[in-house]
A protein has these predicted regions:
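Hydrophobic/aromatic residues within well-ordered alpha-helical segments
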Residues: 17, 21-24
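Short amphipathic alpha-helical segments
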Residues: 25-28, 75
Length: 86
């Protein structure tokens, strides 16, 4: 079982997110305890040796793996594409 750590930036970003989504993000992040044997929507970041992306609804949780332990480094909001996007 892995120890998950958060950067100060990631904690600040999590606190600024609407509380309706925070529970879902925390549940998915806690599932990283069993990384790499986890069944989540994960994608390895191209060009980065140890960075991954976890998709949680409209949010992307970026994390890196250091000595086998996930470390949350960033939470990004992804806006939906609409006809006005283009």
């Amino acid at each position: 079982m892995n120890q998950i750590s958060w950067t100060k930036k990631a904690i600040k970003q999590l606190l600024s997110i609407d509380q309706r989504y925070v529970k879902s993000i925390r549940e998915k992040v806690n599932a990283l305890n069993t990384f790499p044997d986890v069944k989540l929507d994960l994608k390895k970041m191209s060009g980065k040796d140890s960075q991954y992306r976890l998709r949680v609804g409209d949010y992307r949780v970026l994390f890196e793996v250091i000595d086998g332990e996930p470390r949350i480094i960033n939470i990004q909001t992804v806006k939906r594409r609409t006809s006005t996007t283009y």
